[in-house]
């Protein structure tokens, strides 16, 4: 069973499987973003799913960031709490990534 309890282990989806078939610059953005999100705290949970990678702070608040790798960009969705609308952006360069990191950090620190 996965960390969130949605998928069985036999699905065997890994973070690395999301690196296959995307452009090098997108791969670098994704690796940079992953390192940043994991560095936010010891309680960050990474859950690779078939078409995206979900990040949660705990099992109580399911997901604060979703990253969907595309060929030439990353589609990032951020949820700051259960009542606010999901904020989605498309990132294709470092300056856009820095803006997304700011929103992700805010979401991580805002949720309890």
Regions found by a protein language model. Name each.
Residues 1-112:
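Charge-dense, helix-prone N-terminal extensions
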């Amino acid at each position: 069973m996965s960390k969130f309890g949605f998928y069985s282990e036999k699905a065997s989806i890994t973070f690395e499987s999301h690196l296959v078939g995307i452009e090098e610059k997108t791969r670098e953005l994704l690796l940079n973003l992953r390192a940043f999100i994991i560095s936010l705290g010891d309680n960050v949970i990474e859950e690779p799913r078939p078409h995206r990678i979900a990040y949660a702070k705990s099992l109580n608040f399911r997901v604060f960031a979703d990253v969907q790798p595309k060929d030439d960009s990353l589609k990032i969705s951020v949820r700051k709490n259960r009542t606010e609308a999901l904020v989605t952006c498309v990132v294709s360069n470092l300056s856009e990534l820095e803006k997304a990191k700011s929103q992700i950090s805010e979401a991580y620190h805002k949720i309890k």
